[in-house]
């Protein structure tokens, strides 16, 4: 959005004198704080999907609420580098904000990955209730505070599915596959139990890896599969709906703390408000992605009901098994599972 600066031109000496007197009556620091424009570069790995849609509505909201004092520019589709580079840029200040699935922040704090525990949520509605839980928000948005980050947003994008070059119609078809996963031990352990070799990879690298045969498939959401033209390399998506893909919005802490207090409040307020506003959009985008996938010639596959249940039984202990390796991780896992139960009970 374009920032328009107002210019005042003194047409006569008398008018200039009045203006100069008024300006001198205002403390210099206050005038500077009001007039300064703060550039906010926002990075995200997706395009025309839930994370970048959140970035867009957040950017518009903070520009409006700040009266143009914050100029927010969104860089979707990993324009500012791979996911690890986007995270580093946000930590160290070359980028002011990143909107990225929480598991990829695991290098900052391993507790970011707890959202990837299989079976945590059964639906997007439950996932959206989970992200609104005060205990969950307090935990997730506090992570990384000692590593240069300030959390402002948390929401569920969609469930995970698996795209593959050959169809995965049964649990047995997972065995021996090399699949890209997110950067989470919860995911690598889960798919390992299904006989998969997990390969952690940034989203922008997945399509070339599929085309080159480096991997057999990938875990991601229907949004990226459709919007990033994955059908050029693979046409089969198995709708396992696990785990949920949760996204955090992190701001560079040093940049944030240097802002005037009123602008800090706007960023925090809009981060939370747009985390709620995105929910209906996420549901709509998911529905359209599913329809677009089949309309473009892709196939959406559901495991037989008994095999889906068997898969969930196989994965049921992953969360506890992975989290028990570290007390902090175990505590975070308990906070999320307790909140998930509250969300489930309230539906």
Residue ranges and their predicted role:
Residues 1-16, 21-22:
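Twin-arginine (Tat) signal peptide motif
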Residues 2, 34-127, 135-347:
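N-terminal secretory/targeting leader peptides
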Residues 20-21, 28, 333:
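Local alpha-helix boundary/kink/capping signal
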Residues 26-33:
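Sec/Tat signal peptide C-region and signal peptidase I cleavage site
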